[in-house]
Protein backbone atom coordinates (compact mmCIF):
# COMPACT_ATOMS: atom_id res chain seq x y z
CA UNK A 1 0.00 0.00 0.00
CA UNK A 2 1.30 3.46 -0.93
CA UNK A 3 1.29 5.97 1.90
CA UNK A 4 0.95 9.51 0.61
CA UNK A 5 0.91 11.60 3.81
CA UNK A 6 2.15 15.13 2.98
CA UNK A 7 4.11 13.95 -0.06
CA UNK A 8 2.66 15.08 -3.43
CA UNK A 9 3.01 11.45 -4.48
CA UNK A 10 0.77 11.33 -7.53
CA UNK A 11 2.01 14.63 -8.88
CA UNK A 12 5.64 13.52 -8.67
CA UNK A 13 5.02 9.99 -9.90
CA UNK A 14 2.78 11.40 -12.63
CA UNK A 15 5.65 13.52 -13.91
CA UNK A 16 7.93 10.49 -14.05
CA UNK A 17 5.19 8.56 -15.83
CA UNK A 18 4.71 11.22 -18.51
CA UNK A 19 8.40 12.07 -18.89
CA UNK A 20 9.46 8.49 -19.52
CA UNK A 21 6.36 7.88 -21.60
CA UNK A 22 7.71 10.60 -23.88
CA UNK A 23 11.17 9.04 -23.94
CA UNK A 24 9.63 5.64 -24.67
CA UNK A 25 7.74 7.13 -27.60
CA UNK A 26 10.69 9.11 -28.93
CA UNK A 27 14.01 7.32 -28.46
CA UNK A 28 13.29 3.85 -29.94
CA UNK A 29 11.48 5.17 -33.02
CA UNK A 30 13.23 8.45 -33.81
CA UNK A 31 15.81 6.71 -35.99
CA UNK A 32 13.02 5.02 -37.95
CA UNK A 33 11.45 8.41 -38.62
CA UNK A 34 14.78 9.80 -39.82
CA UNK A 35 15.24 6.77 -42.05
CA UNK A 36 11.83 7.45 -43.57
CA UNK A 37 13.16 10.89 -44.57
CA UNK A 38 15.88 9.18 -46.60
CA UNK A 39 18.78 9.95 -44.26
CA UNK A 40 21.85 7.71 -44.16
CA UNK A 41 23.25 5.94 -41.10
CA UNK A 42 25.76 8.70 -40.31
CA UNK A 43 23.11 11.44 -40.30
CA UNK A 44 20.76 9.30 -38.21
CA UNK A 45 23.53 8.59 -35.71
CA UNK A 46 24.36 12.28 -35.32
CA UNK A 47 20.75 13.38 -34.94
CA UNK A 48 20.12 10.60 -32.43
CA UNK A 49 23.20 11.38 -30.35
CA UNK A 50 22.55 15.09 -29.85
CA UNK A 51 20.33 14.57 -26.82
CA UNK A 52 22.99 12.48 -25.07
CA UNK A 53 25.85 14.84 -25.91
CA UNK A 54 24.10 18.01 -24.75
CA UNK A 55 23.60 16.50 -21.28
CA UNK A 56 27.34 16.84 -20.72
CA UNK A 57 27.09 20.61 -20.41
CA UNK A 58 23.42 21.59 -20.26
CA UNK A 59 22.58 19.77 -17.02
CA UNK A 60 25.46 21.61 -15.35
CA UNK A 61 24.19 24.97 -16.63
CA UNK A 62 20.62 24.37 -15.47
CA UNK A 63 21.88 23.13 -12.11
CA UNK A 64 23.83 26.35 -11.69
CA UNK A 65 20.76 28.42 -12.59
CA UNK A 66 18.70 26.58 -9.97
CA UNK A 67 21.42 27.04 -7.35
CA UNK A 68 21.61 30.74 -8.16
CA UNK A 69 17.88 31.46 -8.25
CA UNK A 70 16.50 28.85 -5.85
CA UNK A 71 13.54 28.41 -8.24
CA UNK A 72 13.75 24.75 -9.16
CA UNK A 73 10.13 24.28 -10.26
CA UNK A 74 10.24 27.48 -12.30
CA UNK A 75 13.17 26.03 -14.23
CA UNK A 76 11.34 22.72 -14.74
CA UNK A 77 8.20 24.45 -16.02
CA UNK A 78 9.96 26.86 -18.36
CA UNK A 79 12.28 24.24 -19.81
CA UNK A 80 9.40 21.77 -20.27
CA UNK A 81 7.50 24.42 -22.19
CA UNK A 82 10.42 25.40 -24.40
CA UNK A 83 11.21 21.74 -25.03
CA UNK A 84 7.69 21.37 -26.40
CA UNK A 85 7.86 24.64 -28.32
CA UNK A 86 11.20 23.91 -29.98
CA UNK A 87 10.34 20.32 -30.88
CA UNK A 88 7.22 21.48 -32.73
CA UNK A 89 9.50 22.91 -35.43
CA UNK A 90 10.38 19.34 -36.43
CA UNK A 91 6.97 19.29 -38.11
CA UNK A 92 8.10 21.89 -40.63
CA UNK A 93 11.67 20.85 -41.50
CA UNK A 94 13.11 17.63 -42.83
CA UNK A 95 16.68 18.47 -43.89
CA UNK A 96 19.69 17.48 -41.80
CA UNK A 97 20.96 20.91 -40.71
CA UNK A 98 17.54 22.26 -39.78
CA UNK A 99 16.85 19.18 -37.68
CA UNK A 100 20.33 19.42 -36.15
CA UNK A 101 19.71 22.98 -34.94
CA UNK A 102 16.17 22.21 -33.75
CA UNK A 103 17.29 19.14 -31.82
CA UNK A 104 20.25 20.96 -30.32
CA UNK A 105 17.97 23.68 -28.93
CA UNK A 106 15.36 21.13 -27.86
CA UNK A 107 17.94 18.96 -26.11
CA UNK A 108 19.34 21.85 -24.08
CA UNK A 109 15.89 22.46 -22.61
CA UNK A 110 14.82 18.81 -22.37
CA UNK A 111 17.87 17.75 -20.38
CA UNK A 112 17.01 20.23 -17.61
CA UNK A 113 13.83 18.67 -16.26
CA UNK A 114 14.75 15.20 -15.02
CA UNK A 115 17.74 16.08 -12.76
CA UNK A 116 15.72 18.87 -11.16
CA UNK A 117 12.65 16.66 -10.67
CA UNK A 118 14.92 14.07 -9.05
CA UNK A 119 16.19 16.74 -6.66
CA UNK A 120 12.64 17.96 -6.00
CA UNK A 121 11.45 14.43 -5.28
CA UNK A 122 14.26 13.76 -2.83
CA UNK A 123 13.64 17.12 -1.15
CA UNK A 124 9.96 16.28 -0.69
CA UNK A 125 10.87 12.84 0.66
CA UNK A 126 13.30 14.25 3.18
CA UNK A 127 14.29 11.52 5.61
CA UNK A 128 12.00 9.05 3.82
CA UNK A 129 14.29 8.66 0.81
CA UNK A 130 13.66 4.90 0.90
CA UNK A 131 10.27 5.68 -0.68
CA UNK A 132 11.95 7.06 -3.79
CA UNK A 133 11.52 3.82 -5.71
CA UNK A 134 7.74 3.89 -5.22
CA UNK A 135 7.68 7.26 -7.00
CA UNK A 136 10.28 6.53 -9.67
CA UNK A 137 8.86 3.15 -10.68
CA UNK A 138 6.06 4.83 -12.64
CA UNK A 139 8.64 6.07 -15.12
CA UNK A 140 9.80 2.52 -15.79
CA UNK A 141 6.23 1.36 -16.21
CA UNK A 142 5.34 4.08 -18.70
CA UNK A 143 8.54 3.55 -20.71
CA UNK A 144 7.71 -0.12 -21.21
CA UNK A 145 4.10 0.71 -22.09
CA UNK A 146 5.18 3.29 -24.68
CA UNK A 147 7.76 1.07 -26.36
CA UNK A 148 5.45 -1.94 -26.61
CA UNK A 149 2.34 0.04 -27.59
CA UNK A 150 4.03 2.07 -30.32
CA UNK A 151 5.84 -1.00 -31.62
CA UNK A 152 2.46 -2.56 -32.30
CA UNK A 153 1.00 0.74 -33.50
CA UNK A 154 3.65 1.22 -36.18
CA UNK A 155 3.00 -2.26 -37.52
CA UNK A 156 -0.23 -0.82 -38.90
CA UNK A 157 0.31 2.93 -39.20
CA UNK A 158 3.07 5.03 -40.83
CA UNK A 159 6.00 6.34 -38.78
CA UNK A 160 4.90 9.92 -39.56
CA UNK A 161 2.45 9.61 -36.68
CA UNK A 162 5.44 9.64 -34.32
CA UNK A 163 5.77 13.43 -34.29
CA UNK A 164 2.23 14.32 -33.15
CA UNK A 165 2.35 11.52 -30.57
CA UNK A 166 5.61 12.82 -29.08
CA UNK A 167 4.42 16.44 -29.15
CA UNK A 168 1.20 15.49 -27.37
CA UNK A 169 3.17 13.60 -24.74
CA UNK A 170 5.53 16.56 -24.23
CA UNK A 171 2.53 18.85 -23.81
CA UNK A 172 1.28 16.59 -21.02
CA UNK A 173 4.71 16.78 -19.35
CA UNK A 174 4.62 20.57 -19.38
CA UNK A 175 1.01 20.78 -18.15
CA UNK A 176 1.69 18.31 -15.37
CA UNK A 177 4.77 20.26 -14.23
CA UNK A 178 2.49 23.19 -13.40
CA UNK A 179 0.92 21.17 -10.58
CA UNK A 180 4.08 20.05 -8.79
CA UNK A 181 4.63 22.23 -5.71
CA UNK A 182 7.94 23.88 -4.99
CA UNK A 183 9.70 22.49 -1.95
CA UNK A 184 9.07 24.83 0.96
CA UNK A 185 12.38 25.63 2.57
CA UNK A 186 14.51 28.48 3.79
CA UNK A 187 16.64 28.16 0.68
CA UNK A 188 19.15 30.92 0.28
CA UNK A 189 21.08 31.34 -2.92
CA UNK A 190 24.77 31.11 -2.31
CA UNK A 191 27.15 33.95 -2.95
CA UNK A 192 29.52 31.30 -4.26
CA UNK A 193 27.08 29.98 -6.88
CA UNK A 194 29.37 30.71 -9.80
CA UNK A 195 30.59 28.32 -12.46
CA UNK A 196 34.12 28.52 -11.06
CA UNK A 197 33.01 27.98 -7.45
CA UNK A 198 30.86 24.99 -8.34
CA UNK A 199 33.47 23.48 -10.65
CA UNK A 200 36.19 23.54 -8.01
CA UNK A 201 33.95 22.86 -5.01
CA UNK A 202 35.31 19.82 -3.13
CA UNK A 203 32.94 16.87 -2.98
Region annotations inferred by a language model:
Residues 74-89, 167:
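Structural signature of the two symmetry-related core transmembrane helices
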Residues 52-60, 143-144, 148:
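Residue-level signature of mid-helix packing/kink "hotspots" within the transmembrane helices
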Residues 2-55, 203:
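Helix-loop boundary and gating motifs at the non-cytosolic
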Residues 57-71, 154-155:
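Helix-to-loop junctions at the C-terminal end of transmembrane segments
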Residues 1-7, 177-203:
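Juxtamembrane intracellular "pre-TM" segments in multi-pass secondary transporters
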Residues 129-150:
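Glycine-rich segments within core transmembrane alpha-helices of 12-TM secondary carriers
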Residues 17, 86-90, 96-114, 120:
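Hydrophobic core of transmembrane alpha-helices in multi-pass small-molecule transporters
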Residues 84, 146, 161-179:
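Symmetry-related core transmembrane helices of the 12-TM Major Facilitator Superfamily/SLC fold
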Amino acid sequence: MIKVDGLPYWRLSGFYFLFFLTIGCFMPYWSLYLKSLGMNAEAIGILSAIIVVTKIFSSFIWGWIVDYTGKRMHVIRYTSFFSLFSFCFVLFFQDFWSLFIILLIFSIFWSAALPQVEATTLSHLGEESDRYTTVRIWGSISFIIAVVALGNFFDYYPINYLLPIVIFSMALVWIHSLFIPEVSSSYQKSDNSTFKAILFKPR
